[in-house]
Amino acid sequence: AYIGLVYDGNQPLSFLATPGAKDVGIELHSTSKNFNMTGWRCGFVVGNQLLVKAYGDVKDNSDSGQFLAIQNASAYCYDHPEITKSIATKYSRRMDKLVVVLQKSGFKVNKSGGSFFLYMSSAKAAVKTDGKRIEFKNGEALSQWLIREKLISTVPWDDAEPAIRFSVTFAAEDEADEDRVISEIESRLSNVKFEF
C-alpha cells in the first residue's frame, strides 16, 4: 500500500524483486495510500499464480466487487504515476519540517525513508518551562497527554516498545498552509522539553 511513498532518492522495493519470491508469495497493491484514496478498497494482487487464484476465490466469497466509478478512478491513477510522486514530494517536505520541530522539543527522531508516518520512542517525561515534570509510562500515556494538553493528535504504538506515531497527512491547502500547521505544532510544544 505504501510502496510509492519513498523519499530522498530511495526507490520503491518490491517483495517480488527478490529471487524466488514469485514462486512463494503475492504482493497486494492498493490505491489507498499511494493515491490518497483511503477507504476506497481498490487495488490488485500479483505474484504466484496459485496464490493469486486462492486470493481471488476468497474475495469472490467475501464481497462482490467495487462500484465502477471507483474502479475507473483507480485505473486513472495507475495510468498517472506522477500523482504518487507529487504526494510523496508533499509528504517528504512535511516530514522534513516536522522532524525539525520535534527535535527542538527533545524528541529523538529522524525522517523515515517513506510512508507518511513518523515513528519514535515515547518520551519518559515532559518538563514544562515552569519546572513541572509529567511522567509517561508508555506511548499511550504520552499520546493521551499530547491530545488532552496540547491538542496534538498522535497514535500510541506500544506493541514492541513504548512508542508513538505522528502523521503528515494533515489538511493544508498549500505549502504556506503546511508551514502554518507545523508552526502551530511548534507553538504548542514551545513550553515543554521531552526526556527519553
What are these regions, as identified by a protein language model?
Residues 1-196:
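PLP-dependent class I/II
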